[in-house]
Swiss-Prot record:
Cysteine pairs bridged by disulfides in the record: none
Residue numbers annotated as active site: 379, 503, 505
Name of the protein in its database record: CTP synthase
Database matches in InterPro entries: Class_I_gatase-like (IPR029062), CTP_synthase (IPR004468), CTP_synthase_N (IPR017456), GATASE (IPR017926), GATase1_CTP_Synthase (IPR033828), P-loop_NTPase (IPR027417)
Species assigned in the record: Methanosarcina mazei (strain ATCC BAA-159 / DSM 3647 / Goe1 / Go1 / JCM 11833 / OCM 88) (Methanosarcina frisia)
UniProt catalytic activity: UTP + L-glutamine + ATP + H2O = CTP + L-glutamate + ADP + phosphate + 2 H(+); L-glutamine + H2O = L-glutamate + NH4(+); UTP + NH4(+) + ATP = CTP + ADP + phosphate + 2 H(+)
């Protein structure tokens, strides 16, 4: 097994995840099987109970793992499926070590950070890498060098560097290069960051610099000199027009070739597929506008996978999608804001929790339904579409979800039976892959091209089966089901009115878009052309 370990310095949020994903993509383009592990030094077991304002969206894996959004980037770039074990947290490590201590696995010994915690970290890394069957395992250590939380993980990979043959492991350090008022790039923070890393016994073979503009030759020379790395291994990861251009950006600087040389991997022929996809993305001329009506609109990372899936749909339809975030509560406060939705070619209601903003979202759904604007609802978006339909079409006044109103006379959305009495919040929802059978001749079947699908889920509430027949008698169709669970709702005769209990965005890939997003953008393009003719 070959390991590529990526650390970060100067500050967090530099883009280590995109760096890892881009390196992995380039190695995959050369014919190698690649997997990736994200190490998060927080004490949480997983990301499931974190606010989107803390870490952005919670990405859901096929096995139900609720993880950091970086793993979503890994899956999209590498076109692979990961598991919950690919996300190692301090919480998981300590939980396992304490469980072993209680079982008596360390009987007679004092349990310590070294060797017990560090050994557990190494064991987790090696087990995941081995099970994946990959040629190369990429490891991202979250946070910044110098953070107290990261120390056990840095010590663990230091030990791995000592234990593995030198041709089996390489260290990459990602740092920030800032510019002063005169535009000169300053390398001191990078130098100090590498110095701090070396004090921990780690010497990076490659330095990747994040900057607004391409790294100047003088700055590259200075970093190479003071950080003791060859100049050709100081890589500029400057801001790109789109994250999917980053693999090409670092490939052109020879990083993949240098890594393969260090790891003694035979050079393969690039199939060119990624480059072609990026070229298609950049050559789009048509443009449509999409409104995402949500409650976490101040932080776009809250809806990262949705934004990427929309982009994938745009690439496939040779159309650029301009996305505007609309705060749901503003629609509740001023109906004039609702009318402004007519400027959009499509409306999307994403998933979420809690009652804040739900009435505003339903106003947006009603506007889309009545004005036949292409609409996509996801998870909570589907539940609200059903509530809106129940109230305004099926004459079920004050219909609601028991999540928001336990005393509603028409609980068209109710808690999952197995969730009743569940007290713990973490990892207890209906999570991960579940299948659905699609109704023959439905729009959903046409969209997917099959009557059997598997998609990822994250929810506690569902459409109440007691109201399905009554709602369908008024025209809505539940065209996808998992046994007696409603997975898809659609309204026939509309340009595009599709809502899913599952999260299709989590399985969307560049070059292979999720069918609902591909269909939404296609409908938006058609709607835009119809409006232009009028």
């Amino acid at each position: 097994m070959k390991y590529i370990v990526v650390t970060g310095g100067v500050m967090s949020g530099l883009g280590k995840g995109i760096t890892i994903a881009s390196i992995g993509r380039n190695l995959k383009n050369k014919g190698y099987k690649v997997t990736a592990i994200k190490i998060d030094p927080y004490i949480n077991i997983d990301a499931g109970t974190m606010s989107p304002y803390q870490h952005g969206e919670v990405f859901v894996l096929r096995d139900g793992g609720e993880v950091d959004l970086d793993l979503g980037n890994y899956e999209r770039f590498l076109d692979t499926e990961l598991t919950r074990d690919h996300n190692i947290t301090t919480g998981k490590v300590y939980q396992e070590v304490i469980a072993k201590e209680r079982r008596g696995d360390y009987l007679g010994k004092t349990v310590q950070i070294i060797p017990h915690i560090t050994n557990e970290i190494k064991n987790k890394i090696r087990k995941v890498a081995a099970r994946s069957g990959a040629d190369v395992c990429l490891i991202e250590i979250g946070g910044t060098v110098g953070d107290i939380e990261s120390m056990p993980f840095l010590e663990a990979v230091r030990q791995m560097h000592r234990e593995e043959p030198s041709e089996n492991i390489v260290f990459i350090h990602v740092t920030l290069v800032m510019e002063d008022l005169q535009g000169e790039q300053k390398t001191k923070p990078t130098q100090h960051s590498v110095k701090e890393l070396r004090a921990l016994g780690l010497s990076p073979e490659v330095i990747v610099t994040r900057s607004k503009t391409p790294l100047q030759e003088s700055a590259k020379e200075k970093i190479a000199l003071f950080c003791d790395v060859p100049q050709e291994l100081v890589i500029s990861a400057h801001d790109a027009g789109d994250i999917y251009e980053v693999p090409l950006e670092i490939e052109e600087q020879g990083l993949t070739t240098q890594l393969m040389k260090h790891l003694r991997l035979e050079s393969g022929v690039d199939d060119g597929g990624w480059r072609e996809m990026v070229a298609r993305m950049k050559s789009t001329t048509d443009e449509v506008k999409l409104a995402i009506v949500g409650k976490y609109t101040n932080l776009e990372d809250s809806y990262l996978s949705i934004l990427e899936a929309v982009k994938h749909g745009g690439i496939d339809n040779a159309c650029r999608v301009e996305v505007n975030m609309v705060e749901a509560e503003t629609l509740e406060e001023d109906l004039v804001e609702v009318e402004k939705l007519k400027q959009y070619d499509g409306i999307l209601i994403p998933g979420g929790f809690g009652g804040r903003g739900t009435e505003g979202k339903m106003l947006a759904i009603k506007f889309a339904r009545e004005n036949d604007i292409p609409f996509l609802g996801i998870c909570l978006g589907m539940q609200l579409a059903v509530i809106e339909f129940a109230r305004n079409v099926a004459n079920l006044e004050n219909a609601n979800s028991t999540e928001f109103d336990e005393d509603t006379p028409y609980p068209v959305i109710d808690i999952l039976p197995e969730q009743t009495g569940v007290a713990d919040m973490g990892g207890t929802m209906r999570l991960g892959d579940y299948d659905a059978i699609l109704k023959e001749g439905s729009f959903a079947t046409k969209l997917y091209g099959t009557n059997y699908i598997v998609e990822r889920h994250r929810h506690r509430y569902e459409v109440n089966p007691e109201f399905v027949d009554r709602l369908e008698s008024f025209g809505i169709v539940f065209s996808g089901k998992n046994k007696n669970r409603m997975e898809i709702a659609e309204i026939p005769g509309k340009r595009f009115f599709f809502a899913s209990q599952f999260h299709p965005e989590f399985k969307s890939r560049p070059g292979r878009p999720s069918p609902p997003f591909k269909g939404l953008v296609r409908a938006m393009c058609k709607y835009r052309k119809e409006r232009e003719v009028q």
